[in-house]
């Protein structure tokens, strides 16, 4: 059997790994448009419930990625000068690039054919394959080529957000609510790299607001640096 996978992100790579573990004789090719070390975003988060499923499905890969985890059990909400803490949730964060590197290594060791900097226009690029998997993201060309079958829909939400990174440590999944003369801003922040998982602490810091607030703050015409400075002053 031959399988072609469009998209070398975590989903495509992990599917390839699970299929290879299930049947090593299957020939699997993963095709990715970007380079192996290209990534978008900072960190990824998994709940303990999801990680339990990963551990049961593939203990070896679970052990490989778990060395990179930053774990926390609490959720902190900061609002009106107070901190509200809720415990017992269980999450782990890690660098998205770190996750890709681990999965690429495992897939390569299992004999998956990984091809980078290669475009996929549609299922026809995998003409000899018995199964084609579309793991090519929100704007999937594979899914679009069978739009009448999959009937995809996009529900675009109105809020505006900026995805920032910081070297500040967060011991909990952290939410801030901060209001000024322009309106209400909210943040969710989490640590994805720490002393155990990397040379320095790194965290994701996402700021969100309504479009009306975004415009009143003048952020609709702000540069990246001006946006960062505004958020830095606010939080």
Located regions from the model:
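Beta1/beta-strand and adjacent pyrophosphate-binding region of the FAD-binding site
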Residues: 1-11
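A structural signal for isolated positions on well-ordered beta-strands in alpha/beta enzyme cores
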Residues: 4, 27-29, 113
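Conserved Rossmann-like nucleotide-cofactor binding loop
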Residues: 11, 15, 36, 139
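Glycine-rich FAD pyrophosphate-binding loop
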Residues: 18-41
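A short acidic, helix-capping loop that chelates divalent metal ions and anchors anionic groups
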Residues: 37-40, 85-86, 214-216
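Short, solvent-exposed loop/turn segments at secondary-structure boundaries
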Residues: 40-43, 90, 217-220
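Conserved N-terminal helical subregion
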Residues: 48-165
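Conserved FAD-binding catalytic core of PHBH/FMO-like flavoproteins
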Residues: 105, 128-131, 135-235
């Amino acid at each position: 059997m031959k399988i072609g996978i469009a998209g070398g992100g975590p989903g495509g790579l992990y599917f390839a790994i699970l299929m290879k573990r299930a049947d090593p004789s299957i020939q699997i090719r993963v095709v990715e448009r970007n380079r192996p070390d290209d990534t978008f975003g900072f960190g990824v988060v998994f709940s303990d419930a999801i990680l339990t499923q990963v551990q049961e499905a593939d203990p070896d890969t679970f052990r490989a990625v778990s060395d990179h985890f930053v774990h926390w059990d609490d959720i902190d909400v900061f609002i009106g000068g107070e901190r509200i803490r809720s415990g017992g949730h269980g999450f782990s964060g890690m660098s998205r690039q770190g996750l890709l590197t681990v999965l690429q290594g495992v897939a390569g060791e299992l004999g998956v054919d990984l091809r980078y900097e290669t475009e996929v226009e549609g299922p026809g690029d995998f003409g000899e394959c018995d199964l084609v998997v579309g793991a090519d993201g929100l704007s999937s060309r594979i899914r679009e080529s069978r739009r009448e079958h999959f009937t995809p829909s996009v529900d675009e939400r109105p809020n505006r957000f900026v995805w920032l990174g910081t070297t500040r440590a967060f011991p909990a999944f952290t939410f801030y609510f901060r209001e000024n003369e322009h309106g209400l801003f909210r943040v969710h922040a989490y640590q994805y790299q720490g002393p155990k998982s990397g040379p320095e602490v790194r965290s994701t810091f996402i700021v969100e607001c309504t479009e009306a607030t975004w415009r009143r703050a003048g952020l609709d015409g702000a540069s990246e640096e001006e946006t960062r400075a505004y958020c830095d002053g606010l939080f």
